[in-house]
Design a protein with these regions (language model features):
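Conserved small/polar residues in nucleotide/adenosyl-binding loops
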Residues: 210-217
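Structural signal for the N-terminal portions of transmembrane helices
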Residues: 126-144, 212
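Transmembrane alpha-helical segments of multi-pass membrane transport proteins and ion-pumping complexes
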Residues: 12, 16-23, 49-58, 63, ...
Length: 227
């Protein structure tokens, strides 16, 4: 039980580090263009990250990312030391990349930490390889998808604004930056808030598996003793 508490505390620490690691992404444009002050922008982003939880629960109706994170390792191989090792690795890597200013994905770091710890403990049979390969594919696909979508939107915006006077465009774009920042923060909250839920869910599964008696133990305890 003590180890479970340690993991939950580290999971919350991971979420905190992930917050200051990624917070700048959603507020960079509204701060650099002086739409909001840095303090106002942080409050803006924090509010919409918080709102994202309720969107996931009451509108989307599920926490798919949390389930994916918790199912990275095959259930029978999930142990608290594996989860602890994965979380510590993710925290360490997030701090290193933040310190060096290197963009990185906390989701992929966390899942990689779980997978590495499980492979070290029990071999490749301990991981859900199909899930991990699907996740790894988006490390390479995401930048290209973002580039193509941004390219298309830029063409659309330039076409719409081709006859708009610059001062009018500036007024509208400042307002739209608030909308885009809010949407970015909601997306960040939908994605990243669930990772900690996945860590805690996996830890609780491991704790239950460790403390629950196996069917063999139960059947053995019920066998009458021979005289």
């Amino acid at each position: 039980m003590e180890l479970l508490i340690v993991i939950i505390v580290l999971a919350l620490l991971f979420d905190f580090i992930n917050g200051f690691h990624d917070a700048a992404n959603s507020i960079a444009t509204i701060v650099s263009t002086k739409v909001l002050t840095p303090f106002q922008a942080v409050l803006w982003a924090a509010f919409f990250n918080f709102v994202a939880f309720f969107i996931a629960k009451y509108i989307i109706g599920g926490f798919g990312i949390a389930n994916t994170v918790s199912k990275t390792v095959v259930e029978e191989f999930i142990t608290l030391p594996i989860i602890l090792s994965g979380v510590i690795a993710a925290i360490a890597w997030n701090l290193i990349t933040w310190w060096k200013g290197i963009p990185s994905s906390s989701s992929h770091t966390l899942i990689g930490g779980f997978a590495g710890a499980a492979i070290m403990a029990s071999g490749f049979g301990a991981i859900q390889l199909n899930i991990i390969l699907k996740i790894a594919a988006f490390i390479f696909l995401a930048p290209f998808i973002g580039m193509v979508v941004a390219f298309g939107f830029t063409i659309l915006v330039l076409h719409i604004c081709r006859r708009v006077q610059p001062h009018k465009a500036e007024v509208w774009f400042k307002k739209l930056q608030l909308v885009s920042s809010a949407m970015f923060s909601i997306g960040h909250g939908l994605n990243d808030s669930q990772k900690v839920m996945g860590i805690i869910a996996a830890a609780m599964i491991a704790c239950l598996l460790y403390t629950s008696p196996s069917p063999r133990d139960i059947s053995g305890s019920r066998m009458p003793s021979s005289a």
